[in-house]
Amino acid sequence: MSIDAKLSRQASGSKAGVACVPDAYSFSEARSPGTRFALMLSAVAAGLAGGAMLHSAMSATSALTGLFIVLALAGGFLSTWSPCGYSSLSLLRPAGRYSFASVLRWSPTFFTHALGYAIGAVVLGGALGMAGWLLFSSLPFSYMVAGMAVLALGYGAHQFGFMKMPYPQRRAQVPHDARFRFRSSVIGLLYGYALGMNYLTYVQTPILYIVTGVALFCGDVKTAIVIIGIFNIGRCLPVAVNFLPVKNVTVQVWLARWQERAVEVDGFLLLSVGSAALMLLVL
């Protein structure tokens, strides 16, 4: 039997069983080096201009706090383009056909998922805050800002492919077999905690390192918990899309289509926020 005939038989067999997702033939592609370099320069320019505008509108501390909150929330959202982000959106869904009843039955899963993220923020943020209180409580605020800003610039260039930065990550995934052993609400809690700890699974955004650094060097336990909590809010909220009548394949295809653009947004944010922070320190 020819290969084409075998493939035809397999396809017809699949159709008789479960519905198959069609193969993708077009994928998100990285831009040319020239375009990426232009985006880098525009990010730095936007950051410098934005820093100067913020300096004239408010105090440096308020401006830096606002910039960091935006960066942390956006970083949490951009982590959706990690393998664990794809998985949580796919696995933590209402069972059966979409209806008000199915969404109502699924709601506890979302809320336990959010609770898991909150627990992760308390554990990770508490540990970082305690370590910072012991080691860095006397570190001048300007030193921390300068260090984190330079680190953000480095990782911004890394995201655009012009610099190689260290990327220590545990290349692990949420345990998919858990869905066969626990009820949906328990799975939501376990996944939320694993993802909320941020270093138990692979996270595809270096904004995590900036968030971790700020939580560590702030030297205060409560502040560190809030910092990790802000990042985790950005991570958790995308799962709320499953409250809507959107098919799983639609969500997954949309994520795949914007994969490279998410990396560019990541780099743009790091470069612009890092540049703005340095401008605020200089002025």
Curated annotation (Swiss-Prot):
Cell membrane in keyword set: yes
Keywords: Cell membrane, Membrane, Transmembrane, Transmembrane helix
Pathway: One-carbon metabolism; methylamine degradation
Name under which the protein is recorded: Methylamine utilization protein MauF
A GO cellular-component term linked to this record: plasma membrane
Phylogenetic placement of the source organism: Bacteria, Pseudomonadati, Pseudomonadota, Betaproteobacteria, Nitrosomonadales
Cellular localisation: Cell membrane
Membrane topology: Multi-pass membrane protein
Transmembrane segments: 37-57, 58-78, 116-136, 143-163, 187-207, 210-230, 263-283
